[in-house]
Amino acid sequence: VNILEAARQNSINRISHASSMAAHSFLPGSDSLKTLYGAYKMCDEQISEVYWQDHKVPSMCLRPAIVNGVGRDQGMTSKQTVAMLAAAFGEPYDIPYTGNVSHLSAAEVASAFIHSVSYDGDGAFVFDIFGESININETIKMINKIKPNSKITSSGSEMPFPSKLSDT
């Protein structure tokens, strides 16, 4: 809200902000989201829509899936990157989830944000950025290919988010 209000007060003609694939994590047969984080991100998206409706503050919201790479060391979805770092240092690491997950590089997501802020649009737009859906066991195989005999494992439940959606 603070960024949108600052944009309104200072006649800024476009902003770009991040949501998350967690905004898609609805409980089966329900309008309720599975996670507080997903509800928070969905709320941000709706606030942007209202700022466009009431104040004509345009915005571009991107919903990246799991981002891997430099700078990803916080939060549940950073654990693949943490595993890569552990392998590089020869340390064991257990990725605390299983199943299929989307893979995006930090560089491609950064590029999407840079391009999104350069777009002049009339509205509050939301776009998904999902990348390739890969089973976490395949990720571990890729890590082992680069760093043989790494001690990377995975356990736990699947992530409560979709692993693949269209990038639209």
Which residues make up each language-model segment?
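Conserved Rossmann-fold NAD(P)-dependent oxidoreductase catalytic core, especially the SDR/UDP-sugar
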Residues: N2-G38
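Active-site beta-alpha turn of Rossmann-fold NAD(P)-dependent dehydrogenases/reductases
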Residues: S16-S20, R63-A65, F130
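Conserved sequence/active-site signature of Rossmann-fold short-chain dehydrogenase/reductase
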Residues: A23-H24, V67-G69, V109, I134
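Conserved catalytic Lys-bearing alpha helix of Rossmann-like short-chain dehydrogenase/reductases
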Residues: I3, Y40-S48
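NAD(P)-dependent short-chain dehydrogenase/reductase
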Residues: E49-V101, E108
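C-terminal substrate-binding subdomain of Rossmann-fold SDR/epimerase-dehydratase oxidoreductases
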Residues: P96-G99, H103-T168
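Catalytic tyrosine of NAD(P)H-dependent dehydrogenase/reductases that use a Tyr as the general acid/base
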Residues: Y37, K41, V101
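Hydrophobic pocket-lining residues that define ligand/cofactor binding sites across diverse proteins
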Residues: A7-N10, W52, S116-V117
